[in-house]
Amino acid sequence: MTVTTSAPSGGGEAAVPPEDLVTLTIDGAELSVPKGTLVIRAAEQLGIEIPRFCDHPLLDPAGACRQCIVEVEGQRKPMASCTITCTDGMVVKTHLTSPVAEKAQHGVMELLLINHPLDCPVCDKGGECPLQNQAMSHGNAESRFEGRKRTYEKPVPISTQVLLDRERCVLCARCTRFSNQVAGDPMIELVERGALQQVGTGEGDPFESYFSGNTIQICPVGALTSAAYRFRSRPFDLVSSPSVCEHCSGGCATRTDHRRGKVMRRLAADDPEVNEEWMCDKGRFAFRYAQLKDRLDVPLVRNAEGVLEAASWPEALEAAARGLTAARSRAGVLTGGRLTVEDAYAYSKFARVALDTNDIDFRARVHSGEEADFLASRVAGRGRDLDGTGVTYTSLEKAPAVLLVGFESEEEAPGVFLRLRKAWRKHKQRVYALATHATRGLEKAGGTLLPAAPGTETEWLDALASGVGLEDSGTAAAQALRAEGAVIVVGERLAAVAGGLTAAVRASAATGARLVWIPRRAGERGAVEVGALPSLLPGGRPATDPRAREEVAAVWGLAELPARYGRDTHQIIEAAATGELSALVVAGVEPADLPDPARAREALDSVGFLVSLELRPSEVTERADVVLPVAAVAEKPGTFLNWEGRVRFFDAALKPEQMTRRLAPTDTRVLHMLADAMDVHLGLPDLRTTRAEIDRLGAWDGPRASEPAESANALPRPAAGEAVLAGHRLLLDQGVLQEGDEALAGTRHAAHARLSSATAAEAGVADGEILTVTGPRGTVGLPLRITDMPDRVVWLPLNSVGGGVASDTGATPGSLVRIGPAARAEEALEEVEA
């Protein structure tokens, strides 16, 4: 038999030319593979499974466990198939045809089991353990070992969520290689030598990596286990359901394991085109928010005494319908960025059909009219599964150069960070970032900082476009962006910079680099597509275009749609606070997420009628007139559209028949029932109908919205004792979807303020001391970390423990704040109160 293989499928790569192929024989079967292919991979292509522990297709070869030994003709001894590459004319015999290879593998297995404990009945890995399986298939029937097994103290917590059992470890180095190579976090290593060798961490240096959970999943023997899952269940007790992560716009494929109606754990699924086999710890561990005891399970209605009390669904829907009908054309809808495509579409339709308004916006964050124009002209209707264009994970990894603007990959889209780091390791991709300082994520991706104070991004982008007025690193970046395949990545934070997105479009046109927008939340890309914006209808249709409105009205069975350009989130909040709007429908939005939380709370207190669709009690439900519980991601089917424009469908992991409690309906179902109660036909009773209607509308084929055309604002000029505020959210912060997992919370990065050395000296604060930052509404104090960054700029994590910047200070990035030592904090606070 002769087999010829070319490039791996799924990547869209051309076939390997014949001169780049080598031909070898494995167990009598001849095959041709690309040069550089490992023998163990070539055997897999023939369906031959060579036992292994250390080998992993996404890690560099190590040859640590020696379990994959094969016989190679012409070699003096058996060789590890995971480390040798195929050569022309090579003849390989595996354990299936070679007594030498079989004996060697049996011997290695016998040695591995000498000190391995008999923990299988209680080990979390039992039932899905490669060592257990291969001991049965490739081990001796009896052990010759009669001594006492080596023991260690166990388990050893190497972080709050990863526990180490050294007795079980076979020193495969999968965990250490992943941490070093893939995540760039060399926080665990193999220490000691010989018989004393073991996995360890530095003294007082815990394993605080955003990707530590991957080491648990790829450990082949249960030496690394999850603190939250340990001894909770056995693999054969679990039902596994494919799903998609709901935490960021990456769209990572996951596997949800559940038992008796309760999610027990979540694992990374294998998707070579998206997350490969990895996921961040937030996606892996942050699912318990839906299982907390305060979960809403019945509707609530505010009674005549002003107290929320439980109500039946008909009662709650009638109360909500009565209030919203009275406010028709004077109501706003805030949806947040976490909704599925179908749910976001339902809100978009509900706003126009039931409330007769375009006052709807998903952007519970800093936003602008310039961003709305950018999304309408450059994002809507474009992407991998929309029009077949756009940047993907694969093209981002292959790009010769990438510029990040208003985007921190490790904190805001960890899957993107892993691809950037992989690209730097494999082919020295050049990564540049317009930011205040070099973040850990940028350093781990081999990136170069282009130091930019808040507001100067527009000037930087124009300079990169023209190639004029740049210093060495800027000149190199401008040249790199002109290489074929280069990419400019803009994040949602660039919306805070006047002219920033306009300049990004100009830079893309001038350099030829492809432009891609990567938001932070999972539902934002889909919300753009279904018209959860004041300026857009579904399919990228401009809300002010008569033909666009006619198309949508025809599908929705209406005579006409509202023609007025709607209010954005900021304007909706202002209108609610001043009484211009008399009702709000709020879904999954926290005031703390908004640029001005205090004003948002005033609006919620002032608005005449408030309906909240939520999972758990929040600041919004506390103020709501009607609270309607909705389903969590694990409890419903749906679709996310990731930043690539790739459709990510998932089914419900938890089904009604598995539950001991009644599952809440989806947002779409609730809005359908609410519209019925308002005597309005929404026509979205289920997912299938909703999906079909979205497909029927399709993409807009008319003229697109105009490109953004915003100019830069005058930059603030801080005096002594002042600074321009900069900041972004950390991956693990005080977000409500992270609640319920104390082990995960224990790995949050400590919150610090950052200043340049000159600014710190001017402010009278030394490294490690408390720096106070005072805005228009209050003060926050954090330990100072002196950093190489522009002068008179202060960087703060925006929503970390000890530093809810917008809530505590009333300041937003780009604004002026006062800075000083802790001793001046009370004085500054008194001035604010005065």
Predicted feature residues:
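Short alpha-helices
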Residues: 436-437, 443-473, 500-506, 635, ...
